[in-house]
Amino acid sequence: MEEYILEIFNSKEELCAKYKIDNIKILKLDDEGAKTRLALIKTKNSNLKFIFMYYDMELKPQLINFFKRNFIILGIQSKIIRINLENNVIDTLVDFSIIPFFEFLENDSYLIAIFEMGISVISKDGELKWKLELPEILIDWEIVDENIKLSYFDGKIGIHSLQIGELLS
C-alpha cells in the first residue's frame, strides 16, 4: 500500500492554484463560512485522493496509515474517520460533536484517539473498540503497559484499560 500524507490549505483557491485543478469535490464536515480549512489527502506521488472541508479549531488534523490494511484513519475536528482505500468508503468511527480531537497514540495493539474531553480506542483492524466521554478536560495522557493514564484539569488521575475502557483506578 502506498503511504498517504495530509496537507492543509487555508482556502479552495490556494489548493486549486497549487495543484492546478478547476473542479474539485469537497467532502464537507462543517458548513462553509466561519473559520474553515481544507485537508487534502494524497499519495507521496501527489495523486489526490480526498479533500475535506472542516472547521478550524486551531488543532491540526492527523492521518494514520495502516500499511498492512487497505484503510487510513483521519482524526479531524471532533471526528475519527476511517477511509477504505479499495472502495473509497468513508466511515465516521467516532463523533464527539463539539469536543475537539487532539492526537493519536499507538501501541502494538491499539490506536488511541485523544480528545479534549474524550478518548476512543480503535483496533489495528480499524474497528472501534470503545469510546468514552470524560467528565473533565484532559491535560496529559500516556500509555502505561496495556492501560492509559489520563490526567485531568482538576488534578485527578484516571487509569483505564485499553482493552475494554474500564476505569482501573
Regions found by a protein language model. Give the residues of each.
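Aromatic (tryptophan-biased) beta-strands that constitute blades/sheets of beta-rich domains
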Residues: 40-57, 89-100, 127-134, 168-169
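A glycine-rich, hydrophobic loop/mini-helix early in the fold
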Residues: 44-90
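Short loop/turn segments that connect beta-strands within the blades of beta-propeller domains
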Residues: 34, 68, 76-78, 86, ...
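Repeated scaffold domains used in trafficking and secretory/extracellular systems
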Residues: 2-30, 51-69, 95-109, 134-147
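WD40 beta-propeller blade core
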Residues: 81, 120-121, 158
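Acidic, glycine-rich flexible loop segments
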Residues: 114-137
